[in-house]
């Protein structure tokens, strides 16, 4: 836990370090509890643990510090598999993500990415944060943007 002014306590020192290291265009995966984080991270991304933390809480905290990309899609989710599409499965957590992204200045759109393509994209991410999120299809990728000079300290 980090106890600093203005830094949400859900952001660990390891996660803060990774956020600071990331550059424009680097991607961060916020992985749900069922995501194969350790397997994916064997391919290169840094593995960060946030066990027990729900993604909306973590996303809200991250977006206080993390500029979203405005030149390209800023967020992506794992698309439903065909059988879940046929069932008409709803994914209410996506609405929460969209609202948080809008509050951070994004249009709130999230590109749906086919399941196995999502895994491959995650292997190229800068880091994967393993969370305690239990919602189905809770995985989210966010892309880092730039901080304009007038917003820099």
UniProtKB/Swiss-Prot annotation:
Q: Name one GO biological process term.
A: fucosylation
The UniProt keyword set, sorted, is: Isomerase
Q: Does the keyword Isomerase apply?
A: yes
Gene3D superfamilies, A to Z: RbsD-like domain
EC nos:
5.1.3.29
Can you tell which superkingdom this protein's organism belongs to? Eukaryota
Cite the binding residues for substrate: 32, 78, 119, 137, 139
Q: Listed GO molecular functions?
A: fucose binding; L-fucose mutarotase activity; racemase and epimerase activity, acting on carbohydrates and derivatives
The record lists the catalysed reaction(s) as: alpha-L-fucose = beta-L-fucose
- Which InterPro entries does the entry mention? RbsD-like_sf (IPR023750), RbsD/FucU_mutarotase (IPR050443), RbsD_FucU (IPR007721)
Record: active site: 24, 69, 119
Family to which the UniProt record says this protein belongs: Belongs to the RbsD / FucU family.
What this protein is reported to do is described as: Involved in the interconversion between alpha- and beta-L-fucoses.
According to UniProt, the name of this protein is: Fucose mutarotase
Native species of this protein?
A: Danio rerio
Gene (UniProt): fuom
């Amino acid at each position: 836990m980090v106890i600093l002014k203005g830094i949400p306590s859900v952001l660990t020192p390891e996660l803060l370090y990774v956020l600071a290291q990331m550059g424009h265009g680097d991607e961060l995966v916020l992985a749900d509890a069922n995501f194969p984080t350790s397997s994916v991270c064997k391919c290169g991304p840094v593995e960060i643990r946030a066990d027990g933390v729900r993604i909306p809480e973590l996303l809200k905290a991250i977006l206080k510090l993390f500029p979203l990309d405005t030149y390209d899609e800023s967020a992506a989710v794992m698309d439903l598999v065909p059988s879940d599409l046929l069932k008409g499965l709803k994914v209410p957590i996506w609405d929460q993500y969209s609202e948080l992204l809008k509050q951070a200045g994004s249009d709130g759109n999230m590109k749906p990415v086919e399941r196995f393509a999502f895994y491959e994209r995650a292997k190229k991410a800068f880091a994967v944060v393993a969370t305690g999120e239990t919602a189905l299809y809770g995985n989210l990728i966010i892309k880092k943007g730039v901080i304009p000079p007038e917003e820099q300290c």
